[in-house]
Amino acid sequence: MTRPTLILFLRVPAIGRGKTRLAKDIGKVEAWRLSRAMTAGVLGRVRDPRWRLVVRVTPDGALAGAEPQGRGDLGQRLQRAIRANATGPVAVIGTDAPDLDRAHIARAFDSARRHGAAIGPAADGGFWILALSAARARSVGFEGVRWSTAHACADTVTALGGEVARLETLIDIDDQAALTAWRARARGRRGPGAGPGRPAERPGG
C-alpha cells in the first residue's frame, strides 16, 4: 500500500503579511507572534512515519527545503499540489487550527479510504483538513469555491462531488473572536490555572 501524503500549506510568517483580519484586531506584531507559534506548533505535531510530509510555502522560496505553492488563487494552488502527489491518498492542512494533531490526521486518512473524501469543517465555515483517496485526488478541482468566506467548506464539498465524509469541527484562528473562543476552550481543558502567557494561551504550545 502506498504511504499517504500530508501536504502542509504554509504562509511563512512575516510582520504585516498574512493574518490581516487578526492583525486588525490585535496588531501586526502580536498577530505575527501568534502566527509563528501556530506554525511551529503544527510542524511539531503533524510529523509521523505513517505518512509523508510535504511542505508547500508562500512566498515561493521563503523556507529552505519546502516546495513553492506557485501562482494562482488558493484553489489552483491546492489543485496542483494535490494532483502532483496523487500516487496514494492525499490530505492537505494549514496552520490555523491549533488543536489539530496526528490523531485527527489519521482519522481523516481512514475516512478518505472508506468514503473517497473527508473534510474537517472549521467553526468559521472554512476547513482544517481535506483528505482524498488517490482516485479522487487525481481529478480534484475547486471551481466555484468562495475562499476566505463562511461558504468555503460547503463550496468545497459541492466542488468535489460524490461522497464526502465530515469530520469533527475545529476552531481556525483567523480573527480575535476565534482566538478568544479557542483560549476559552483551552482554559476549560487545562484548568483555571492557565492564565496569560501560559500554555493555554499559546496556540502553538
Give the positions of each predicted feature:
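Active-site acidic Asp-centered loop
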Residues: 93-95
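N-terminal nucleotide-binding beta1-loop-alpha1 segment
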Residues: 1-22
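A short, N-terminal amphipathic alpha-helix
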Residues: 33-51
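Conserved alpha/beta core of the MobA/IspD/sugar-nucleotide pyrophosphorylase nucleotidyltransferase superfamily
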Residues: 154-205
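Short phosphate-binding loop-to-helix
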Residues: 62-90, 149
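Short, polar loop motifs at secondary-structure junctions
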Residues: 55-61
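Conserved donor-nucleotide/metal-binding helix-loop-beta segment in metal-dependent transferases, i.e.
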Residues: 100-126
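Short, glycine-/small-residue-rich phosphate/pyrophosphate-handling segment
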Residues: 131, 135-157
